[in-house]
Every structure is written in structure tokens, then in C-alpha cells.
């Protein structure tokens, strides 16, 4: 193999495939990238067996074809430090990867490329086009997915007639799906998909699912990820249906107010929300720092016999995630009592957030479960779904 490629082009390709590089120490071969030179392209391929990425680079000169397998992160580190010019890459008679750029010379040891896992194959006619809405919807629900890999069925985004994600404390639902059927896409693969969608190169995306593997591709890019083999909880039963209190609030001013009041909140962003007929008072306090309070105008519909403010405790960071996932100028918050989740929605999405328990004897908000460090308390949100 012998090619000449611009340093920038090569580095961009390595950046694309780096997220699917294997980290398992028991399978060191997965820490490699496979380079394949054919005609006028250089193909880069990495996989950790669960996720794989292939990208074809075209802005280069292929002098002789071939393929090689080498340490991906070491190769990227070398390319990053080279000057912005052309890089000559070839294999020598021992199969080592030789790189030359101006006065720099590198020799990188390699492994037999035939030992690297092969790419899954799928027929072209199984793919169907997807629009930018697919990426928008994924982005709008991703925040609610559990970050705990041990809760594997929640460490994902559920794709069906709706897009759904939950971690037990909050839930995001997009009502307008793409006709997928009961797919659990791992969160780490969702993140890779969204990074691909952020690259504005004019490419048209296509997707398909085959043999429990989700594929996404463009002309020069192929992503694949193995789906989670499990069941997503029946989320419909925990959607509040009898909320009698409604607040209509300007979204951006609410975001700004939460960010300010959250500065004085505890480590779990506990905040108190007091709803009056025409105003909302946000407050927080920290035993070590002090407290904060802010009032803003809202349209609040209270219950008929209500003569006191309706007060609830919320995780400000979680509510902020919801508000930032919405697009409208105004947002509707539906509330029931001081124990039931709130519901926030717009035309296409529904977001649910558990409340924190208010401790009346203290000027602060505490969660129902003791929290140590950054570990979130278990919520009966998911327990209720899984029990039925």
C-alpha cells in the first residue's frame, strides 16, 4: 500500500472512526484501525464488536492498493502533531506502516488485517431515506436516557411509533416516529449517530435494521450498532392523566431564571417552585453558601378552592434539560399534586419529571432517598412501570 494524503483529510477521517475503537484490554486487536487503499479512496474501519464505523476518504492519491491494521490512537496522535501538509503513507516489506511528512519519519508496527473483525453485510435495497427530523428527535429525547450501563434497557433510546428515553427520574417522548418497530438503540451509539448528523456535508442519510443491527449510512460513511436485546418498560402507564393545574411560561426567560437560581442550589440542583395566579417564585438554598430567589410572570390556572400558592420541589438541572430540548417561545407545565410528576409538552413532544419531596420544617428541598456523591436516588418511576 502506498498513498499520499493531506494531513487534515486523514485526521478528519480518524476523528470520525475513533468513537468505535475498542477499549477491551482482553481483545487488544480492537484498539486498531483498518486502512484499505482502493482506486481513489482510503477506507478507515474501527469496531468494538458492538459498534462499528467505516469512512471513505477521497481527497488523496493512491499509488498502490493494499490494507494494513495499526494502533488507532497512536496513529491519530502522530497525525495530530504533523504540520499541515501532505503525508506519504506506505507499508514496507515487513508490513510496517511508514509515514513521512517533510522531515519527520515514523514507523508503526502493525497486525495482520485479516484477523480484524469483518464488517456486517447488508443488501442495499433494505435501506430507506431519513430526514433531519430523525436527528432532531433523537437529540430531543437523548437527555433523559439513563447513563447507568447496568440498567441496559434504559441506557438507550426506544424507537417505535414514538421515540422514548427515561432514566427513572425524567422521561422524554416524541410522538411522531419513523415507523421503526420496537428498537432499543444503545445510548453510546445514539451519541455516535448524532455526531454524524452534525456534520453538515450535504450527505443524504439512509437507515435500516437487520439481524438486530441498526445501520446508518451516507455515500462515504457507514455506522452500525448492535441493538439491546431487552424490553423497554410500558411507559404509557406513568404518563400523568389527571393534572388539574396549568402554568404557561415564556421558555427562554424561565431557562435564564433557573440558571441563576441554580447557582445557589445544592449538589443535586434542588429548587423550590411557588406558583401564584400571575407569578412564579423560584428559590434555592445551600447550607454552605446561602440562598437565591427570583420572581417571574406566568399564567397559572389553579384549582377552584385554592387560596395558597402551589409549591413543588424540582431538580433544576433536569427541568433545564427539558426546556432546552423544546423549540417554542412558550411552554406549558401541567401539575397534579405535590407527589405526582409534572408534564411539559409542545406540539410533538411530551416530557415528564418526578418531583423532589419538600421538607416543611427546613428552608430547603430534600430528595426521598439519601444521595451520596453524584449517585442519583432510585425512583419508583421505573419501578412502577416494571411492576405492571
Indicate where each model-derived feature is located.
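Structural preference for solvent-exposed beta-strand-turn elements
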Residues: 1-388
